[in-house]
């Protein structure tokens, strides 16, 4: 699986992303719940009863064969703020999904790079073991000829055993990395995802500047989510204050009365079908201490969120500056590792030429090959460290998912 395929699948089916989407859907449904009181609610029932004497009420209503009631909010400022708060919470939940996608994309890319590194390191370790095996065979021949001590053969055998042990360890690390990558993508623990050998383009390099940090702060989903929470708390505070405002409700009801409840005996006029529609006005006179407590609580929580927002902004700015420094350090290390590898490869070419001329034994050539493999591992480590550092910069600036999706 390529890096692009792995990240694309991860941002779709990773459990953390799925849970964030479910939270977003819950927040959207809460908006519908908050709007419900403004929709007419109609209930139909019956208060059927037999009356002996005066027709007394049944649950506050006269006895009736069929009874229907309808009610809804017409003006309720507190509930309107509750709806606005629910909408803001839904918007913040959407930002949480976007932030989780960036986080999962970076985690998946890091695991992919780790799995690819373990795979390549394992291949080089097996080559080292093969080279050391050839050295052991050469030393064994020298021991038989009396040109080397048996101790040298034992030391060579120990080197072979250590190389094989390292290869097995790297193979186990590769399997663990592939399993971790499968879990990040959203597969099961029984699955493994092996990276595809590909020539990926180097992640784009961003330049550090005031505009870069400012744009990253404006685009960061975590900061925007905190800003959304602060706005929601402001609406909650205004909604708590609105509890002191009057409210107007729509009320309507219909009753089908019976003739066996003695209405004719006690009322001059009687009709079976009865209905009424109107509005109910409520004006709070003494709201109690709860309103002021709710307002103070919302103010306190809003102040707490503002402190968290300031801390998150400072931390993000510091992380961005540190990430750019890490990119520069990794880039320098990659250049040094590349030069070191070139020297090792040139040395191996010289040793091979001397061996063909009979001026150098096979043992020294294989040792040079082992040294070259070690330089290859160091070179790969430096390249992967640079790649991960640049992915981290893209994550902090909010461009990671979009950049990876443009990969071939």
PLM region descriptions:
Residues 1-47, 72, 87, 147-149, ...:
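Bacterial Sec-pathway N-terminal export signals of envelope proteins
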Residues 8-18, 25-40, 67-85, 95-102, ...:
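A glycine-/polar-enriched beta->alpha junction
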Residues 19-34, 100, 104-125, 134-141, ...:
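Amphipathic alpha-helical coiled-coil segments
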Residues 45-74, 82, 195-206, 238, ...:
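Small/polar, glycine/serine/threonine/aspartate-rich low-complexity segments that form flexible
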Residues 103-215, 326, 330, 350, ...:
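Periplasmic alpha-helical coiled-coil/stalk elements that build and connect Gram-negative outer-membrane
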Residues 170, 221, 305, 382:
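Metallo-beta-lactamase
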Residues 180-188, 388-403:
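Long amphipathic alpha-helical coiled-coil segments
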């Amino acid at each position: 699986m390529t890096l692009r395929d792995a990240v694309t699948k991860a941002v779709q089916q990773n459990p953390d992303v799925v849970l964030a989407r479910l939270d977003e859907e819950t927040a959207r449904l809460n908006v519908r719940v908050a709007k419900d009181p403004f929709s007419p609610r109609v209930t139909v029932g019956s208060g059927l009863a037999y009356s002996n004497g005066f027709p007394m009420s049944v649950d506050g209503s006269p006895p009736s064969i069929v009874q229907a009631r309808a009610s809804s909010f017409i003006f309720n400022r507190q509930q309107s703020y509750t709806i606005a708060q629910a909408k803001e919470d839904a918007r913040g939940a959407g930002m949480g999904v976007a932030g989780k996608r960036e986080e999962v994309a970076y985690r998946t890319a890091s695991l992919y790079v780790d799995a690819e590194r373990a795979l390549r390191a394992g291949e080089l370790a097996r080559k080292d073991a093969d080279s050391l095996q050839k050295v052991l065979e050469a030393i064994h021949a020298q021991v038989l000829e009396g040109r080397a001590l048996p101790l040298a053969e034992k030391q060579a055998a120990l080197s072979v055993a250590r190389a094989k042990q390292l290869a097995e360890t790297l193979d186990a690390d590769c399997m663990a990395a592939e399993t971790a990558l499968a879990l990040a993508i959203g597969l099961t623990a029984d699955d493994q995802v092996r990276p595809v050998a590909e020539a990926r383009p180097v992640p784009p390099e961003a330049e550090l500047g005031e505009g870069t940090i400012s744009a990253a702060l404006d685009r960061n989903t975590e900061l925007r989510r905190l800003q959304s929470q602060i706005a929601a708390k402001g609406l909650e505070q205004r909604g708590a204050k609105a509890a002191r405002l009057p409210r107007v409700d729509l009320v309507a009801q219909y009753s089908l009365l019976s003739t066996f409840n003695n209405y004719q005996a006690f009322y001059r006029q009687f009709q079976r079908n009865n209905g009424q529609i109107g509005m109910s006005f409520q004006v709070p006179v003494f709201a109690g201490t709860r309103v002021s407590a709710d307002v103070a609580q919302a103010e306190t929580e809003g102040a707490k969120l503002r402190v968290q927002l300031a801390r998150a902004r400072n931390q993000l700015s510091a992380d961005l500056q540190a990430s750019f420094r890490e990119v520069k350090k990794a880039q320098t290390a990659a250049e040094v590792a590349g030069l070191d590898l070139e020297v090792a490869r040139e040395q191996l070419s010289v040793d091979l030429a001397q061996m063909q001329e009979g001026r150098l034994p096979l043992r020294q050539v294989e040792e040079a090959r082992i040294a070259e493999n070690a330089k290859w591992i160091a070179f790969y480590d430096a390249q992967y460290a640079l790649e991960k550092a640049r992915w981290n910069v893209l994550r902090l600036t909010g461009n990671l998912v979009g950049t990876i999706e443009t990969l071939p």
